[in-house]
């Protein structure tokens, strides 16, 4: 964010990575904006809106990736929250697992159906796209942009089409460049500090505390109770393997925000000169992988 930009011209963009305390911050951020100022999109689908539609809103909050938010034709103030990658992955598993069977059947949620029917080991070993893309370095992929983790590597997507592959180094590089361009970033344990920094810029109501919402302890009519499954050596190994790059990005980000008092304001990142790898022999296009599951 440029220090010369009038805050009234800024769009607040909350890039909400699932199971990082984002429901809490969304609740408090949204109280500052009228419905007319608020983009209704809560998932990764900003590309379905026209530039004119995006221009009318000042608050964006959803499970976005770092590429699609660049379509917003305003000066941006970008906020995100990270979490220990293994904790986040387990939290996401139990969140999906807890959904009642009736709700899953009624809404046809494939990822929830698969999760509900199996074990944690089944979840971590699944190659179904609805599961695999969310278990393999998910935070890094979202922070890198419109990227999907596949069994053959990391696919870079543009306008719903695959345009190339990313190496591990390229994926991490894109994620870190984007993180360094964000205005406020922190850990799930720092929600109050994160809110305070955003509130100062946008003139929001100060809060004495920021209580967590949507936690596993919360009772909900659509949720079952759950019993944690034992973490066997095999599961532990899979958790480490599937979050390897997430852990690297998380630790590097932690070092940076602790050094800079959680404030990252180093100018806008620019990945437009980035050239992905061309299609490689032996690697299936994403469309073929999905088709093998009848998707």
Q: What annotation goes with each model-predicted range?
A:
Residues 1-2, 57-69, 221-228, 271:
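Short, motif-level signal for alpha-helix interfacial/capping segments enriched in acidic residues
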Residues 249, 253-295:
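Long, low-complexity C-terminal extensions of enzymes
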């Amino acid at each position: 964010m440029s220090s010369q930009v009038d805050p009234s011209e800024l769009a607040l963009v909350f890039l909400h990575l699932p199971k990082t305390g984002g429901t809490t911050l969304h609740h408090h951020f949204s109280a500052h904006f009228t419905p007319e100022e608020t983009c209704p999109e809560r998932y990764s689908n900003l590309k379905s809106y026209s530039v004119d539609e995006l221009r009318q809103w000042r608050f964006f909050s959803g499970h976005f990736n770092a590429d699609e938010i660049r379509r917003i034709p305003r000066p941006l103030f970008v906020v995100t929250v990270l979490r220990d990658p293994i904790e986040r992955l387990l939290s996401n598993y139990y969140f999906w697992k807890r959904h009642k069977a009736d709700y899953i059947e009624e809404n046809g949620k494939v990822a929830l159906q698969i999760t509900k029917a199996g074990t944690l080991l089944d979840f971590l070993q699944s190659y179904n796209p609805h599961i695999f893309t969310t278990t393999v370095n998910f935070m890094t992929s979202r922070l890198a942009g419109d990227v999907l983790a596949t069994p053959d590597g990391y696919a870079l997507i543009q306008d719903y089409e695959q345009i190339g592959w990313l190496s591990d180094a390229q994926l991490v590089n894109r994620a870190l460049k984007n993180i360094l361009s964000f205005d406020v970033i922190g850990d799930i344990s720092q929600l109050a500090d994160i809110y305070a920094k955003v509130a100062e810029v946008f003139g929001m109501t100060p809060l004495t505390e920021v209580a967590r919402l949507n936690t596993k302890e919360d009772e909900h009519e659509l949720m079952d109770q759950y019993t944690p499954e034992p973490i066997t050596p095999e599961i532990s190994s899979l958790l480490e393997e599937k979050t390897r790059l997430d852990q690297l990005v998380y630790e590097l980000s932690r070092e940076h925000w602790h050094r800079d008092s959680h404030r990252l304001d180093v100018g806008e990142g620019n990945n437009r000169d980035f050239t992905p790898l061309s299609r490689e022999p032996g690697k299936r296009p994403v469309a073929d992988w999905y088709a093998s599951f009848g998707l």
